[in-house]
């Protein structure tokens, strides 16, 4: 029976009011170690994993524990949650927060690189809408079907088709240039899921999209956001897409999300959760994680998550729970409003 070892880095981002410029280097909370080159594929799970409940040593108390002070300001909660996740879950985490209405911004290790996994599908969609707006490649009915499946259900086949049709890695170069994503780079191997970005760049991308930095027009932006708001509870591969933001913010009625997951990169699970919060998309949240996993017999393997169903894998579930618990510890009332204020 194969096993895997995994480690997790978490990035969280929240945004709020049109046409915001994200400050850099402010309110840094935690430094995250640099990531290693990606060696895996996205949005699927390991072969021959142990039965549910096996393998991962789980903290005797739920995450987050009482060591995360719910009444403290967000900056203090971030610091406590990062430390607690590392100690209790074997998880490294980073976060960036922006309120588009006020321009308030907070970050922790938001400049650390992370593989996008399925977050690269956002860049594919942005390129499709860009070319449609220019009239260079009008969207066909089939294109719209692929966009819907790719964004709502994280369909890898749809992403593969559009990625190849658009020229592969050129998509990342073009989108990064138009949106000012200074730390976002194309995949080293030409595979979209190995694109690298940062928490800060993901926040910048969403802010630029909502502010129409690329000249897409209101209708295209509304369609793009509509797909994110229609995200399915499970991906097309059966993987639970509610981790992180959706389950972590149960009090938010209007949430648009794009999720990503894959294993193994540097012997780690990668999970990414990003979202637009509120009817007016005032807030944008993004969370990325890397979590080390060790099964009880310590046997190591590197599952190909592009071809194997890991929806019931205990290590993946543990990492998802870490993501959700982290978000809950930052927003214990289950909503993002007044995030800079004590939430006791």
What is the predicted function of each stretch?
Residues 94-98, 123, 286:
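Soluble periplasmic/extracytoplasmic beta-strand elements of cell-envelope proteins
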Residues 86-113:
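Short, conserved catalytic-motif segment at the N-terminal edge
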Residues 130-149, 168-169, 217-220:
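Short, well-structured active-site flanking segments
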Residues 16-19:
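C-terminal motif of bacterial Sec signal peptides marking the signal peptidase cleavage site
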Residues 1-12, 143:
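N-terminal export and membrane-targeting signals
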Residues 21-23:
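Bacterial signal peptide processing site
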Residues 103, 113-137, 150, 285:
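Active-site SXXK
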Residues 25-33, 37-93, 164-344:
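Penicillin-recognizing serine hydrolase domain
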């Amino acid at each position: 029976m194969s096993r895997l070892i995994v480690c997790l880095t978490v990035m969280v981002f929240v945004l709020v009011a049109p046409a915001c410029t994200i400050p850099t280097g402010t309110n840094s909370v935690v430094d995250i170690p640099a990531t290693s080159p990606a060696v895996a594929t996205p949005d699927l799970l390991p072969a021959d994993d142990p039965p549910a409940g096996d393998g991962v040593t789980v903290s005797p108390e739920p995450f987050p524990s009482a060591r995360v002070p719910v009444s403290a300001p967000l900056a203090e909660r971030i610091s406590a949650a990062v430390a607690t996740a590392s100690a209790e879950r074997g998880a490294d985490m980073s976060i960036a927060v922006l309120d588009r209405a006020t321009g308030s911004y907070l970050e922790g290790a938001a400049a650390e690189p992370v593989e996008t996994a399925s977050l690269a599908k956002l860049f594919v969609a942005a390129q499709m809408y860009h070319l449609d707006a220019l009239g260079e490649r009008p969207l066909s009915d089939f294109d719209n079907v692929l966009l819907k499946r790719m964004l709502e259900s994280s369909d890898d086949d749809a992403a593969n088709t559009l990625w190849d049709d658009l020229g592969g890695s050129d998509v990342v170069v073009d989108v990064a240039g138009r949106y000012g994503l200074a730390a976002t780079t194309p995949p080293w191997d030409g595979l979209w899921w190995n694109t690298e970005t940062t928490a800060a760049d993901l926040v910048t991308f969403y802010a630029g999209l909502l502010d129409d930095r690329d000249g897409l027009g209101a209708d295209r932006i509304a369609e793009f956001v509509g797909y994110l708001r229609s995200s399915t509870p499970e991906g097309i591969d059966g993987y639970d897409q509610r981790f992180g933001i959706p389950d972590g913010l149960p009090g938010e009625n209007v949430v648009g999300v794009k999720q990503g997951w894959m294993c193994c990169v540097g012997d780690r699970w990668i999970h990414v959760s990003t979202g637009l919060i509120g009817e007016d998309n005032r807030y944008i949240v993004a969370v990325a994680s890397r979590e080390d996993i060790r099964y009880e017999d310590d046997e190591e393997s590197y599952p190909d998550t592009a071809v194997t169903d890991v929806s019931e894998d205990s290590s993946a579930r543990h990492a998802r729970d870490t993501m959700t618990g982290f978000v809950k510890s930052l927003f214990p009332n289950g909503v993002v409003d007044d995030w800079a204020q004590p939430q006791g």
